[in-house]
């Protein structure tokens, strides 16, 4: 499980590339969809995947913070402010890339869970190999 310095490192690594970017599209891996369909709370907890998409697509990433071992994404549209909370778990990671081939570690490239397509033509990818 990542310690505080590693979580801060991830936060600092992604923030300059995603701050002020609009989330245009959210894509879930098949295993995330299958997990939800089988009543397992995987990756997106407490809501349906379609609801998550409706509450994030079209929103701008205003700020990224680290609180303890959590990465907090502050997002907003013209009407609402929202907060996304992420924990890296045992082996999770975020990557900002133009395409999945740019993720240099094969296991992370293969085991992506969620892709946020941004209006700056980059992708914020959450990957977890466990």
Enumerate the language-model features and the residues they cover.
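Acidic, proline/glycine-enriched N-terminal capping motif
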Residues: 1-130
């Amino acid at each position: 499980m990542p310690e505080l310095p590693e979580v801060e490192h991830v936060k600092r690594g992604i923030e300059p590339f995603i701050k002020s970017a609009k989330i245009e599209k959210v894509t879930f891996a098949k295993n995330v969809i299958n997990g939800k369909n089988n009543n397992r709370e995987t990756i997106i907890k407490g809501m349906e995947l379609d609801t998550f998409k409706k509450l994030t697509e079209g929103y701008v990433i205003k700020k990224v913070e680290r609180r303890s071992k959590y990465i907090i994404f502050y997002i907003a549209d013209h009407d609402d402010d929202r907060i996304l909370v992420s924990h890296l778990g045992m082996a999770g990671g975020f990557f900002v890339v133009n395409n999945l081939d740019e993720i240099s570690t094969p296991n992370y490239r293969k085991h992506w869970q969620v892709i946020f397509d941004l209006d700056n033509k980059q992708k914020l990818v959450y990957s977890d190999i466990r």
